């Protein structure tokens, strides 16, 4: 199973695809999943493991992504991480574009600078690739959507 831990509670990676892999996810202590892949919804696989899934599908098509996509993910992540003992796994099919993009939005919403968050993700997960249009999408979301509390 392709899981890269960025912090003690946030991981990024590739697709789950099977019950056996979902069992590995559960054994890793993951309680919440943001599934960015359009190809497959993890929700049915997670039911038996009491893992909450946000299926937030988007195509890896190198086009600008709307703020609503990031808002859904960030709100889910914030709600999940407010609870003690939770762990969040953000993934797409390969863990190269879409999952790192959403992870960037989540980390920045938690107060990380864009550059520091990108360095963390790329440092721990060298296959992560930040397409310019995806970084611009995250920046636009952060400029327009984050509230004045400076989250």
Regions found by a protein language model. Give the residues of each.
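Cysteine-based protein phosphatase catalytic domain of the PTP/DSP
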Residues: 1-87, 108-140, 146
């Amino acid at each position: 199973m392709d899981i890269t831990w960025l912090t003690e509670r946030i991981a990024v990676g590739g697709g789950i695809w099977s019950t056996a892999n979902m069992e590995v996810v559960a054994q890793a202590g993951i309680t919440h999943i943001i599934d960015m892949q359009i190809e497959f919804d993890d929700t049915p696989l997670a039911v038996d493991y009491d893992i909450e899934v946000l299926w937030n599908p988007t195509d890896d098509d190198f086009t600008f992504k709307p703020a609503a996509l990031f808002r859904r993910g960030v709100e889910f992540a914030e709600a999940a991480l407010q609870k003690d003992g939770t762990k969040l796994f953000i993934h797409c099919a390969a863990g190269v574009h879409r999952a790192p993009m959403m992870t960037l939005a989540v980390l920045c919403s938690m107060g990380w600078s864009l550059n520091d968050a990108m360095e963390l993700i790329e440092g721990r997960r060298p296959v992560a690739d930040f397409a310019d249009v995806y970084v611009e999408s995250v920046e636009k979301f952060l400029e327009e959507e984050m509230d004045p509390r400076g989250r």
